[in-house]
From Swiss-Prot:
Keyword Lyase tagged: no
Official protein name in the record: Uncharacterized protein C651.12c
Location (main, coarse): nucleus
Coiled-coil residue spans: none
Start-end of Basic residues biased regions: 1-10
Length: 273
């Protein structure tokens, strides 16, 4: 393996001589200069990326520090201003220095309770200003139902208001006939709510219930109910009231049937409901 000798040129700089020797050594030992240059460029790019990351991180941290300092300054300024507001004024302005001062409105509030009562007696406006709770109580009393009831007559100058009705007094007892009539009316109203009626005879309840249609002049379903009465079967047909039915108020209490006939040895009574 033959090695080439590198001549030193005194006219060239030291860096150029080193580069020449490095290229000669790489060629002597079989290294590819293109690969070396590629690796060198990659190293430079990595260093550039790291520099950019460091700069961005430092910039973010500096922004955070700057914001924190500004926030601390705002807090200090706010606390100092609130403390200044809490401190009472040691040297109040005189009446001549105030822009809207006058002898009528420049009233000094007394410190003793006797003077306060005197002010309240002379001017109720000042007392109301000193005690706002009394004004709230007065407003609440004015809004109460009794006060409203009394105010209606006092405003219109109608004199003494009449007494309110008392619900504790006993009402006048109604006669027995009116009670029976109202009870009968209630019974009829209750019967209107039912479609099926139960016919009772000698404590025997109707047992069979079925739906059939009889008599063409009735346009609704008829409910068939059978019961024993004096060893004879009595059939009661309960009919849903329609516009074509005969309006008979007495039929609501099953006193007068609308129709009677005999069918297969059974007595049939038709009552609308």
């Amino acid at each position: 393996m033959s090695s080439k000798k590198v001549k030193y040129n005194p006219r060239k700089s030291a860096s150029q001589n080193e580069a020449t020797s490095a290229s000669a050594g790489s060629k002597a030992f079989g290294f590819n200069s293109a690969k070396k240059e590629k690796l060198h460029r990659m190293a430079l790019s990595m260093e550039a990326i790291e520099d950019v990351e460091d700069q961005s991180f430092n910039g973010k941290s500096s922004n955070l520090v700057r914001k924190r300092r500004g926030l601390d300054e705002d807090i200090d300024e706010f606390s100092s201003s609130s403390e200044d507001e809490r401190k009472p004024a040691r040297h109040p302005q005189s009446s001549s220095q105030k822009p809207f001062a006058s002898s009528t409105y420049n009233v000094e509030l007394p410190t003793s309770p006797t003077k306060i009562t005197n002010i309240g007696q002379s001017s109720p406006r000042a007392l109301r200003y000193l005690s706002p709770e009394s004004q709230r109580i007065k407003n609440a009393k004015m809004k109460s139902p009794i006060s409203t009831h009394l105010a209606k007559y006092s405003i219109h100058h109608m004199g003494t208001p009449p007494s309110k009705p008392s619900f504790l007094s006993s009402s006048v007892s109604s006669p027995a006939s009116s009670k029976q009539k109202s009870l009968f009316q209630c019974t009829k109203d209750l019967e209107k709510r039912y479609i099926n009626r139960v016919h009772r005879s000698s404590e025997t309840e109707l047992v069979q219930l079925s739906s059939i249609k009889v008599l063409d002049r009735f346009l609704s379903d008829i409910y068939l109910v059978e019961a024993e009465k004096n060893e004879e079967k009595c059939t009661v047909l309960l009919l849903k009231r329609s516009n074509t039915d005969v309006d008979n108020s007495s039929s609501l209490s099953l006193t007068l049937p609308l129709c009677k006939f005999t069918k297969n040895g059974h007595q049939v009574h038709i009552h609308p409901c």
